[in-house]
């Protein structure tokens, strides 16, 4: 197929290293409806392969749209083992489950948010077409919004790239991807302060001095599952703890902005959890 899929390495960086040899089969079915016949062949020769968005089996969950975003909250757990199958697509509220998952689900089916890079100005191109130009490429601001509403909501962001007839990604697309990576690193590469904790429901950060802050990032150690059910982030302003953000799902990564506050100390307060919290990362940033 004349298409490449690029998954955000920042979302599943550790998971991919922990599970070498795991590959992915996209979900498009054979034109004759023979897609399910591929499954036993794949299972025989690549038993660790994951299926994505296939009508017979989907180990990875489509987030419900091709906008590059998912809803919030977004849980990685799900009530049945495949997000799509002929047996479950008729389930009540199926589309809601795709977007949000189920905090009490018994199966680990993380969400993917997909979008073509060339989806701007009324275009939505998963494949290269004659006459294509850079005007179809999403602006950087749109891509950053997608990042925060996918990776920042506990999903993997998957971006469709379109090789041209020479078999290469167009130069304009490459430049935009480079700009995107640089902007992600600029915003979130150097936290003002960061920490981790095990078993604590209050996790504090000291910035050393009063500074403006307008973003936070939380990560759970998902080898222990998603344990947090509700939390808040507080800033100590004029000696008083003030709530600057509240949320529910965290999972692999939660990134959110809030109106800038100037403070020296911040803390994460876990209001509800299913077991002791495993905080892999709690950090704050100032993005301008």
Where are these regions (language model features)?
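Short, conserved beta-strand segments of beta-strand-rich sandwich/propeller modules, principally
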Residues: 265-267
